[in-house]
């Protein structure tokens, strides 16, 4: 066969003869001859006779390996796909021919938003519309050779960005009328995670704190969190608002200085808890749980004295009232127990003494208590179910076996409430070396009294983990109203805090707390290096913090308490008493768990603190991960003695009191420290204020006698601290806005701190002898009455003796040892 090849445009033909094999789809063609003809531009056209070789004569497609001219031009066969909204840049690839090339679209059309560069051959731009586009591109080279190719370009739709979403927590909570609840919002798929808050009833702050309205019937409100980045996206939840329980009219109210006293006091006398019903006797081997389940309101359950009841026992909810209590007690008669209002000791469980503890002063040991023990590690043995109420427990030993961790001997089930509970003349204890975190965990309880009881061996050995903070009594955590509480005439022993309110997640502050006539104690045999040292099973010392601490509480009366033994060396520094409202982080420093936490209206009076590394710590500060508390103010501290403050012996700062405040927290204000007797070796007052200008407000330190220490008024550290210069008058003026420092006797102030550096009306006895105490005893267990001849007799602003009212203290702490 023969083909004629006519060049459509003029160019110089190749002189070489065609004679190449051409690849055909079904075989081979062989040029056997060719013919040249002349085109209109005077150049010869060329033809070739092709002979078929192979089995088939069908020619469906072919390409020339060499068409006989000096060059050829070829266009690429495909383009990469495009996406709407994304920049596109592709090159129409050309091979052969002579540059420069010229490109053009000769049929069809490019996607909207794209264009073809006629000289570079690039197709670029930003496509607008998705679809499949067909078009033909022609390429012509400098010699007039051309080729064209039909393309099919796919343009995909733009990917849909994930929509902004909002989640709110907690979902569907229940709150009491007139109370507050913290809500949180999580915004996803945007870098702007801010929300605006709104509610259909009550009020809500910009940080998500919902204040429920006062209601007389149960109602609801809707809380809404709306994305700032995309206001069309929001989340909501329904809040059920219940009617608050009626508040019992205050039995005693008023103020002590700036602090409001408790409005309500728990009544816990036997006559206040009548049980006129039946007697249920449970002997050794019997089922306490069956008895609890079967008891009717007004019944008394007698547990065999001297017997042990092993298990975890749940006190169920029953419809009891103030005239029908359920009493669970030892079967021993009242005549062999200490009288009501008298503290029990381990003597009544057959133990005449315990190592390192004060003497029990019992003539003989007799086991008249019923013993309840958890059989293994965990929580128990006593748990109060949701709604449990009107239970009085008397004459019971509550304990645990050796080995493992026990978290709370007596507790409420998590997240539930219980009310009207009295723990009377009980011995709660761990084992000498095992970790036992709590004696009583108050949880969301109301109207609870712990009276005339004895707590020993609550301790932890871990700096982090499951057991870091041991307490005899703990409360102030949860999302339910808490209080009033009565903690009166107990021996309270714990390595961490003997009593702690707060330190965990909460949306309420426990209120109306009475802490009176207790002995708070840590055995010195727990201090490493002491004779008879006792630590954990591996020899690690127990973690010691302080004797009494408030992180979340309001209206607290702390009166007539004896506090002994606190040392540092762990996360705290051996203070006796600590007031630090805290928006707590958990043990691994995540989360601000208590933005509603506060410490307000605290009265501390007629008490003693002894054998400590430091006396008082009062601070409004951020938590370890930057959370701020709600408030900390209105403290009245008067008529206390703080002796045997020894920083060297007890591993701490050797200071009487510290006042501290950091930036971004409520101002520490309305603090009264009056009529105090103290003997710090290092510093009378440490001040820390890192607020870039804000001052503590209305701070009063009056009518006291204290050792000056080596550095009487001292900075807690830092170049930005207002107390940086460590001079009394300069510090007071820089750190306090409105303060009083009047009629204080500062014993032994050195010449480095002359009277000119102190406020006027300050007295400067050169030594303790000049103060004329009845019996100073080097500031350790002395008689701190002033002699009639003392120059500080009747020298107070109120006409009283300077220092603590020792007679009033002795009356309040009588028989507290």
Question: Could you describe each region identified by the protein language model?
Answer:
Residues 95-99, 108, 188-191, 200-202, ...:
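Short glycine/proline-centered coil/turn motifs in the loop regions
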Residues 247-278, 342-359, 363-367, 538, ...:
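Acidic, glycine- and Ser/Thr-rich low-complexity intrinsically disordered tracts
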Residues 110-128, 136, 204-215:
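Strand-loop-strand motifs at the edges of beta-sheets in extracellular beta-sandwich domains
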Residues 31-72, 157-160, 244-247:
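Bacterial Sec-dependent N-terminal signal peptides
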Residues 179, 184, 267-309, 314, ...:
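Acidic Gly/Asp/Thr-rich repetitive segments characteristic of extracellular carbohydrate-active
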Residues 323-326, 367-384, 404-414, 432-443, ...:
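Extracellular beta-strand/beta-solenoid scaffold signature
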Residues 325, 389-400, 417-431, 446-461, ...:
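Right-handed parallel beta-helix
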Residues 270-274, 297-304, 310-371, 385-394, ...:
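Beta-solenoid repeat scaffold
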């Amino acid at each position: 066969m023969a083909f004629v090849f006519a060049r459509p445009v003029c160019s110089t033909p190749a002189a070489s003869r065609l004679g190449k094999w051409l690849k055909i789809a079904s075989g081979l063609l062989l040029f056997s001859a060719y013919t040249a003809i002349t085109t209109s531009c005077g150049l010869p056209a060329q033809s070739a006779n092709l002979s078929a070789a192979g089995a088939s004569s069908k020619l469906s497609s072919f390409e020339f390996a060499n068409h006989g001219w000096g060059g050829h031009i070829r266009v690429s066969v495909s383009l990469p796909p495009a996406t709407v909204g994304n920049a596109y840049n592709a090159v129409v690839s050309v091979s052969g021919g002579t540059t420069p090339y010229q490109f053009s679209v000769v049929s069809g059309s490019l996607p909207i938003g794209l264009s073809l560069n006629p000289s570079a051959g690039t197709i670029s731009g930003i496509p607008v519309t998705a679809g499949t586009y067909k078009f033909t591109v022609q390429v012509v080279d400098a010699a007039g050779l051309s080729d064209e190719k039909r393309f099919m370009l796919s343009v995909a739709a733009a990917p849909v960005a994930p929509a902004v979403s909002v989640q709110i927590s907690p979902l569907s909570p229940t709150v009491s009328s007139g109370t507050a609840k913290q809500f949180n919002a999580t915004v996803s798929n945007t870098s702007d995670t801010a929300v605006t808050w709104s509610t259909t009833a009550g009020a809500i702050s910009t940080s998500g704190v919902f204040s429920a309205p006062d209601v007389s019937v149960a109602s609801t409100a809707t809380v809404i969190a709306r994305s700032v980045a995309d206001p069309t996206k929001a989340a909501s939840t329904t809040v059920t608002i219940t009617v608050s329980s009626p508040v019992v009219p205050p039995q005693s109210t008023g103020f002590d200085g700036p602090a409001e006293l408790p409005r309500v006091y728990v009544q816990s006398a036997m006559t206040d808890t009548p049980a006129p019903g039946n007697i249920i006797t449970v002997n050794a081997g019997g089922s306490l749980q069956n008895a609890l389940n079967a008891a009717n309101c007004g019944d008394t359950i007698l547990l065999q004295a001297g017997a042990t009841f092993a298990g975890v026992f749940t006190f169920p909810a029953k419809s009891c009232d103030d005239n029908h209590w359920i009493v669970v007690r030892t079967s021993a008669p009242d005549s062999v127990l200490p009288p009501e209002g008298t503290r029990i000791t381990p003597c009544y469980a057959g133990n005449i003494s315990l190592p390192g503890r004060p003497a029990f002063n019992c003539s003989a040991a007799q086991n008249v208590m019923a013993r309840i023990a958890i059989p293994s590690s965990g929580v128990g043995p006593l748990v109060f179910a949701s709604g449990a109420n009107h239970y009085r427990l008397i004459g019971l030993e509550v304990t645990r076996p050796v080995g493992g961790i026990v978290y709370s001997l007596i507790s409420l089930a998590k997240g539930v409430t219980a009310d009207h509970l009295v723990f009377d003349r009980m011995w709660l204890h761990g084992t000498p070396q095992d970790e036992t975190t709590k004696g009583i965990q108050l949880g969301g309880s109301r109207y609870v009294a712990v009276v005339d009881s004895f707590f020993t061996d609550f301790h932890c050995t871990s700096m982090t983990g499951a057991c870091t903070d041991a307490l005899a009594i703990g409360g102030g955590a949860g999302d339910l109203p808490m209080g009033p509480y009565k903690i009166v005439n107990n021996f309270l022993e714990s390595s961490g805090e003997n009593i702690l309110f707060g330190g965990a997640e909460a949306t309420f502050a426990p209120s109306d707390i009475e802490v009176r006539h207790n002995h708070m104690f840590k055995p010195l045999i727990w201090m490493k290096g002491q004779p008879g040292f006792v630590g954990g099973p591996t020899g690690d010392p127990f973690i010691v913090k302080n004797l009494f601490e408030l992180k979340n509480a309001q209206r607290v009366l702390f009166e007539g308490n004896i506090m002994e033994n606190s040392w540092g060396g762990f996360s705290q520094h051996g203070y006796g008493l600590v007031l630090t409202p805290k928006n707590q982080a958990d043990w691994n420093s995540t989360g601000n768990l208590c933005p509603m936490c506060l410490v307000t209206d605290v009265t501390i009076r007629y008490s003693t603190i002894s054998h400590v590394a430091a006396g008082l710590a009062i601070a409004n500060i951020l938590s370890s991960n930057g959370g701020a508390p709600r408030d900390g103010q209105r403290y009245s501290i008067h008529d206390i003695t703080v002796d045997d403050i020894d920083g060297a012996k007890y591993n701490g700062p050797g200071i009487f009191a510290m006042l501290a405040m950091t930036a971004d927290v409520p101002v520490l204000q309305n603090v009264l420290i009056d009529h105090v007797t103290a003997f710090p070796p290092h510093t009378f007052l440490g001040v820390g204020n890192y607020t870039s200008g804000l001052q503590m407000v209305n701070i009063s330190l009056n009518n006291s006698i204290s050792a000056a220490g080596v550095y009487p008024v001292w900075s807690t550290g830092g170049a930005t601290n207002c107390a940086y210069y460590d001079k009394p008058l300069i510090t007071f003026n820089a750190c306090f806005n409105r303060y009083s420092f009047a009629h204080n006797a500062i014993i032994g102030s050195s010449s480095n701190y002359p009277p000119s550096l102190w406020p006027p009306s300050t007295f400067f006895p050169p030594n303790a002898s000049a103060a004329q105490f009845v019996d100073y005893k080097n500031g350790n267990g002395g008689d701190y009455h002033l002699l009639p001849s003392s120059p500080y007799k009747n020298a107070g602003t109120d006409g009283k003796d300077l220092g603590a009212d020792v007679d009033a203290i002795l009356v309040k702490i009588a028989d507290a040892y």
